[in-house]
Regions:
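The feature captures the short pre-catalytic strand/loop hairpin that immediately precedes
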Residues: 58-62, 183-186
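Charge-rich, low-complexity amphipathic helices
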Residues: 9, 47-48, 72, 107-108, ...
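A penicillin-recognizing enzyme superfamily signal
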Residues: 24, 28, 75-186
Length: 186
């Protein structure tokens, strides 16, 4: 498979897996189906969803492209933005801007700063979030994220790797917490 500009695209294991479901592609982190799905939807649709999920460094000039399906974002994404996007999946498709505190009071209990009203924006349907969560639960049960599986707690997540494994990413959530981890070397 090639990108529309002719650049070849490979899966991280350098093999072609033939026809697979989107679910299988998520579980086993297979690149080509992700790019094919984004191509069918159009990179602009994917770009617009990422904007709604709070990705602040996106460039309409450079990032409305097929590699967006694999995290190919020109100016990158922060762990905080990635965590907030995964929190939206965990919350039925509702995005909330991340906050570092909810309320600050003085010694008498007077509210000095109130950040408790963090309104949600419905980015995608709850049914979509549920299907995605279910597939990402299987990433931890039998896919590329088995090492992140937790005993006695539901968890869902997704792994990601750049060329030559210079960057390794895991983002996921439990019913209580959402986190993204990025490991890199030069």
């Amino acid at each position: 498979f090639n990108y529309s500009d002719g650049t070849p695209l490979q899966n991280s294991d350098l093999t072609y897996h033939g026809d697979v479901t989107v679910r299988q592609a998520i579980i086993n982190s297979i690149n080509i189906p992700a790019v094919k799905v984004l191509t069918e939807l159009t990179p602009k649709v994917g770009f617009d969803y990422l904007k709604k999920l709070g990705f602040s460094k996106l460039s309409e000039e450079y990032d409305v492209i097929q590699p967006l399906a694999l995290g190919g974002i020109t100016y990158g994404v922060s762990d905080l933005e990635l965590t907030a996007a995964y929190a939206a999946i965990a919350d039925g498709g509702q995005y909330r801007k991340p906050v570092f505190y909810t309320k600050v009071t003085d010694s008498k209990g007077n509210v000095l700063i109130d950040n408790t009203e963090n309104k949600a924006t419905q980015v995608f349907k709850a049914s979509t979030a549920s299907l995605l969560t279910n597939a990402m639960e299987d990433v931890l049960e039998k896919g590329t994220g088995v090492a992140a599986r937790l005993d006695n707690m539901h968890a869902a997540g997704k792994t990601g790797t750049t060329n030559e494994a210079k960057d390794l990413v895991f983002a996921g959530f439990t019913p209580y917490y959402t986190a993204a981890i990025w490991a890199t070397y030069d």
